[in-house]
């Protein structure tokens, strides 16, 4: 893991995260023009950082937030589509990989709300991962939720997963990506005040807990509704920050992520190898007791057992100490039911 140079090497993936200014757009043509601007940014960053392998833009950076429901439907993209064609061509032209936001992606059933989607494009201009946000930021966001994570071989073979904004507040999604082999988890977000300190802290904790690299791209600026705090960052698999932006609009950070180092750590680290130890619980004591050398593999957590085997019951259980309705009468949001 290295920070401070503009290069990369056969073993290191050069990663840049962009503090892209949150756009406020209303039409398809405006979205496409913004895509062309993102393409120009890619070219400029590659010129300044010749070692760049992967560039990451925030959630909402392509479309902005469509606060008008009709505009949200009118500007929703297809994958592949006009928007992705512009972004893919920029990746191919500059020989870099890119992560881009589509807010939204058209639902398969036209009348249902769009998805909040990320795509990973390789340096040949091919879409190699499409991820739909599993945990939209309720009660405000009205995206239709996705249903799974993905892991693919990224630049130089580094294994990459994508997650979006509020997803990252749930330890389960980080662990799912890591346990499926992800070495770099990319979190694209359009996070606003007042949650700045919590969001900076959680990505470091999740990198540490899951022994993975984390790259965060966050929006900046004010779109007339929310103020976005930036602080796009790149975190090492030991939980230390390699590089972090401030609140500056269109700032960026860059670091080199070693493929060999993370694989070495996951194989040889012992006391802090959380991924291995979770599935080999108490192996020292089990071995000393003559019960084998693999520890305990079974899940000890009652909540997870219930959730997998009876999700409706798990939902009812949490409602007993939270609330039974999605809406809250004391602070209603839209037309969400409060009873």
From Swiss-Prot:
Its EC number is 3.5.1.4. It is an enzyme of class 3 (hydrolase). One of its GO terms (molecular function) is amidase activity. Keywords: Hydrolase. It catalyses: a monocarboxylic acid amide + H2O = a monocarboxylate + NH4(+). Coiled coil: none annotated. The keyword Plastid does not apply. CDD domains: aliphatic_amidase. Residues 13-259 form the CN hydrolase domain. The active site is at 59 (proton acceptor), 133 (proton donor), 165 (nucleophile). Pfam families: CN_hydrolase (PF00795). PANTHER family: ALIPHATIC AMIDASE (PTHR43674:SF14), NITRILASE C965.09-RELATED (PTHR43674). Belongs to the carbon-nitrogen hydrolase superfamily. Aliphatic amidase family. HAMAP family: Aliphatic_amidase (MF_01242). Catalyzes the hydrolysis of short-chain aliphatic amides to their corresponding organic acids with release of ammonia. This is Aliphatic amidase. It comes from Helicobacter pylori (strain Shi470).
